[in-house]
Amino acid sequence: MKLFIFPHSGGFGHNYNFFKKYQFENIDEIYAYDYPRKLRPESKVKDERNFLERVRNAIEWVLSHDIKSEEYLLFGHSLGAFVAYEVGMELKKHGLNPLTVIMSSQNPPVSFPKVRKDFENLYIDIDYFIERLGGTNCNMNKKSMDFYKSLLISDLKLLGTYYPKIPQKGEKLDDITIFCGDDDPVLYPEYWGEWDLCSSSCEKFTYHGTHFYIYQYKEDVMKKIDQHVKGG
């Protein structure tokens, strides 16, 4: 079984290398994605213009790993959770339904239009936003922090172009697994009931922590993913 990982805003695939170190019983191959970004002036890579383009690129990446031959699952943290969800929705249309889509530190996609305004201007005071989220290396030097901020701002602007649709009958994902921290400043519990609009089956796990709770509880998160895949 294959697991595909989509990172948070400003993040990279290597931020989730701990998945590759864990001894899963039911997952054989793990792939972590890097969003196409123009990281250097001389780079020929072009920045993605909108969220839809990000999803399309992610779909191409997943399809390049031959998912027709065996079951697979998708994992996304924060912004990456929306990417994983949309990738799963699109692949389901083509008969390639993921076993589950694991969404970490994110609201139900269909609720995003209701909270869009809260996200549109987050990058104006990016230092305050980073402080609220937590999980950032306090020892990061100024150059590295400025680089991270530039990526985070770019990704937040891209998130502003995300317009999810409410799935019609037969379009919902078969299964979503939800992980979150109980003190996450960008989650809205009043909309959690809308997970039922996104998937026929949802299982939710909550930890004591903030947006990046996963780094504190990664062993337990991966254990629960393995158990869920097994059906336990």
Predicted regions and their residues:
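Short beta-strand/loop motif that positions the catalytic acidic residue
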Residues: I178-C180
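Catalytic histidine-centered segment of alpha/beta-hydrolase-like enzymes
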Residues: G209-E219
